[in-house]
């Protein structure tokens, strides 16, 4: 039986959807202990609890999971975006699309939500050989048991737009899926302003193509 609370769309403040919060002061966020991460990090409480359970299971199998990035607010994401905007040359539309291969416009990142984390390395190549391949294989086999999945897979008939594949990026589906639905209902392009090239948010339809451009929850997985 599906838990009815999972199907209900909770009320999230727009500030939470857009990343206009300080996770260190927000009631629903916990600070991640240093044993799990490489720098000061925050996650939603239920996400952190699920990650700790996954971390323990991975350790028991000889797999080490390390958070290298977790919650990022809109201001932080704006810094990432603007630096790339200034460093990339060429036509503005092309520039925006090239940045969007792997980086989100401010106000559109799943990292704003406290549900998503980057693990171990920020290169797909790391996860294609050696220890990285072992880590990725373990995550593919077991992450869903703890509520996590890879939202940015290779493009396929279901996911034919959005960011390129990110083998390091894992999302806590039970909460992220609810926030994503709330985002679709509450956010429009008038709220995605204030950064370099912001006109391309609507021109490139980033809400539908990028925020919503994620993989499906794995078949036969919990939740």
Regions found by a protein language model. Give the residues of each.
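Extracytoplasmic cell-surface/polysaccharide-interacting catalytic and binding patches
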Residues: 1-70, 74-223
């Amino acid at each position: 039986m599906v838990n009815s609370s999972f199907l209900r769309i909770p009320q999230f403040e727009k500030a939470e959807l857009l990343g206009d919060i300080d996770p260190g002061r927000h009631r629903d966020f916990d600070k991640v202990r240093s044993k799990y991460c490489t720098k000061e990090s925050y996650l939603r409480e239920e996400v952190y609890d699920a990650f700790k359970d996954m971390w323990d299971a991975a350790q028991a199998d000889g797999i080490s999971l390390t958070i290298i990035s977790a919650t990022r607010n809109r201001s932080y994401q704006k810094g990432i975006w603007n630096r790339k905007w200034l460093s990339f040359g060429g036509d503005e539309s092309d520039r925006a699309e090239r940045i969007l291969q792997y980086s989100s416009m401010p106000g559109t990142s799943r990292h704003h939500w406290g549900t998503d984390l980057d693990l171990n390395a920020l290169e797909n190549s790391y996860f294609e050989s050696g220890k990285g391949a072992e880590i990725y294989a373990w995550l593919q086999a077991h992450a869903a048991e703890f509520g996590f999945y890879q939202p940015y897979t290779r493009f396929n008939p279901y996911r034919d737009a959005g960011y390129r594949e990110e083998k390091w990026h894992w999302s806590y589906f039970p909460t992220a899926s609810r926030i994503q639905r709330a985002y679709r209902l509450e956010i429009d392009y008038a709220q995605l302003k204030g950064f370099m090239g912001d006109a391309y948010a609507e021109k490139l339809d980033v809400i539908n193509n990028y925020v919503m451009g994620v993989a499906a929850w794995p078949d036969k997985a919990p939740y």
